[in-house]
Amino acid sequence: MLFLLAFAFAGCFTERGDEGELLYGRHCASCHLENGEGLRGVIPPLVNSDYSEKNRDVLACLIRQGIQGSIIVNGKEYNQAMPGNQQLSEADLTNIINYLHKEFKSPKERVSFGQVREQVKNCP
């Protein structure tokens, strides 16, 4: 019963207006820029990112834990480390990912709080 209450309560704090935009601005925009285009040749774009789409099932983990090493985004190689943010809650991650979907079409589908919770639970 307590689990159900916690799950329902957490859902109250996702999808709050512009929360995803605020979180993106605070934690992501300094590198990926407000328009999601990244820094050409250094920081990958988030706009229509095939990498975000291919990694949709672990996107919450990537945001929380960061990325090390080389990645390919939209056919271009990037080798700039992305710091993670362990402080982001599951609700924060849900809001950020859904903001990426809404603004940058990446990933192509929205995520639910439950999907993000499962991703975080299974992070390597």
Can you describe what each PLM-predicted range is?
Residues 8-11:
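C-terminal motif of bacterial Sec signal peptides marking the signal peptidase cleavage site
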Residues 15-39, 54-61:
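Sequence/structural segment immediately N-terminal to covalent heme-attachment motifs in c-type
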Residues 33, 64-68, 98-102:
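Residues at helix-coil transition
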